[in-house]
Amino acid sequence: AAGAGPAKGSDPKMPNLSDIADVAEALGGKSVLVVEKRCVAVRNRHSSCRKCIEACVADAISVGDNNVKIDAEACVSCGACTVVCPTEALVPVEPADVELASAAAEATRALGGNLSVFACARKAARREGDPDKYVSVPCLARMEESLLLQLASHGVGDVVLVDGTCSTCKFGGTSEGVTA
């Protein structure tokens, strides 16, 4: 019955299947989750921050009228916008940071040392190496400092980023840091 509260013996803090289904539907294949209450441009209409728009090679992001919109059809899922957002208003969903860290730990173990290797999806698609020994990311622009620091805190001494010729990639110039 409506308003009856949680079922006997269930934890009211735990999400139920309905909650999980609602979240899955809201994400609906999106690679980036927008948390508008974190966005400085939403919180302050006079803010000039447009870092996400500048990073987006697909022109899929718009900021205005106190909201942030991502055109899911135009988005190429590179993740560059999530890395440049200073307030983490754009959260990577596919792949999530936890998934990347877990995959990096497995690949590092497979290499038998303290080296982590990340390859852009374009390079990984060429299948030139053992896929158990590197982590594939949509674009190297998705790599952020927090992930690298997390790897270092777990004993990873070296990180290798392998690109697939950024200048001819559909993600183009997502990050000067990648092509530098």
What do these predicted ranges mean?
Residues 1-55, 59, 109-128:
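Ferredoxin-type iron-sulfur electron-transfer modules and their immediate structural context
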Residues 31, 113-117, 132-133, 156-164:
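Hydrophobic beta-strand segments of well-ordered beta-sheets in folded domains
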Residues 47-71, 80-97:
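Iron-sulfur cluster-binding cysteine motifs and their immediate structural context
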Residues 73, 118-123, 137-139, 163-165:
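Structural motif
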Residues 127-137:
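Short, basic, glycine/proline-bearing loop/turn elements
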Residues 137-149:
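Glycine-rich anion/phosphate-binding loops
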Residues 147-180:
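Cofactor-cradling patches in redox/metallo enzymes
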